[in-house]
Amino acid sequence: MSDSEQTGEQAAKRTGQLETCQRCGRKQGLVGKYDIWLCRQCFREVARGMGFKKYS
């Protein structure tokens, strides 16, 4: 078992996080608000297409 797999399993046990990004499968940095379940990187790429607006 590699270190990255072990870290992912340990993170799931520690946080109770069972979801993964629906786009790329990443387990960390998830945006779960509104049941989106995208990692933060994927969310940044598709947020405008989903109707989110960026305010500065």
Curated annotation (Swiss-Prot):
GO CC annotation: cytosolic small ribosomal subunit
Needed cofactors: Zn(2+)
MF term (GO), any: zinc ion binding
Pfam families: Ribosomal_S14
Keyword rRNA-binding appears in the UniProt entry: yes
GO BP annotation list: cytoplasmic translation
Keyword Metal-binding: yes
Annotated residues for binding of Zn(2+): C21, C24, C39, C42
Similarity comment: Belongs to the universal ribosomal protein uS14 family. Zinc-binding uS14 subfamily.
Name of protein: Small ribosomal subunit protein uS14A
Lineage, highest ranks first: Archaea, Methanobacteriati, Methanobacteriota, Stenosarchaea group, Halobacteria
